[in-house]
Amino acid sequence: MAGPDIEAVKSYLLDLQESICNALETEEPRARFVEDRWEHAAGGGGRTRVLSGGETFEQGGVNFSHVRGASLPASATAHRPELAGRGFQATGVSLVIHPLNPYVPTSHANVRFFLAEKEGETPIWWFGGGFDLTPFYPFEEDVIHWHRTARNACLPFGEDVYPRFKRWCDEYFFLNHRNETRGVGGLFFDDLNEWGFERSFAFLRSVGDHYLKAYLPIVQRRKAIPYGEREREFQLYRRGRYVEFNLVYDRGTLFGLQSGGRTESILMSLPPVAHWRYDWRPERGSAEENLYLNYLKPKEWLES
């Protein structure tokens, strides 16, 4: 069984960041990604790219990082006590895209690799990641396309993989205090090492490479739909849920902040504008109610 090759993972992730940024810019008439290179105090660093003020994307961030540390923070060892006291390397690409048009969903993707080492002991490593979609005014055909693409990413690795990681995504991206999912899900996996390094790495690449196939057709179909103040206000209200999840539940955010990560890069996932309204409820029979009734509970979107 091949050992972990973090340099190969890092090379793939840098290429993935580049290809995703280039593809997203093709949907944007004027705004471009601005790059910010940074260093991590304990070792390593990253390459953050942010696009803001666009006609298609109000804000989007695509972050690459490769950081080192002398010990893993509590968020990483809570369910893996054998990792306590180990030095670590973590590398990944994480992105969140917040479109301007409320008919275009917000999307999130993340692919990452952890390596935890201790002198004289066998390295412990794992992959994690996935992608998920958060619509405001959903179209069923878009959600089916998203999940079909997610299933295609998984099929070469077994027919049980998509149902397993789809269910994990539904469970992970759930706001307990709201009793609703963050969106319509997709894929989520973590602690993946049971297939060995090469097969696990191949799966990571498949997930990373299918993100654009899942998202760009939806952007292209919906970005020119006319909208008004009502739709914009609802988008901003629902973005508040995104903020709540990221600051209360998200393990990646907690890990980054607890490990002394770069705050600007960690919090770039937050939308540029979000609203909260006290005890707001959608009108009965409205498009806004449709989201609540049909899209914010776990659901099987594909025929078996």
UniProtKB/Swiss-Prot annotation:
Pathway: Porphyrin-containing compound metabolism; protoporphyrin-IX biosynthesis; protoporphyrinogen-IX from coproporphyrinogen-III (O2 route): step 1/1. The record marks 177 as: Important for dimerization. Its cofactor is a divalent metal cation. Its EC number is 1.3.3.3. Pfam families: Coprogen_oxidas. Gene3D superfamilies: Coproporphyrinogen III oxidase, aerobic. The active site is at residue 108. The keyword Hydrolase does not apply. Keywords: Cytoplasm, Heme biosynthesis, Metal-binding, Oxidoreductase, Porphyrin biosynthesis. It is found in: Cytoplasm. Transmembrane segments: none annotated. PANTHER family: COPROPORPHYRINOGEN III OXIDASE, MITOCHONDRIAL (PTHR10755), OXYGEN-DEPENDENT COPROPORPHYRINOGEN-III OXIDASE, MITOCHONDRIAL (PTHR10755:SF0). Involved in the heme biosynthesis. Catalyzes the aerobic oxidative decarboxylation of propionate groups of rings A and B of coproporphyrinogen-III to yield the vinyl groups in protoporphyrinogen-IX. This is Oxygen-dependent coproporphyrinogen-III oxidase. The gene is hemF.
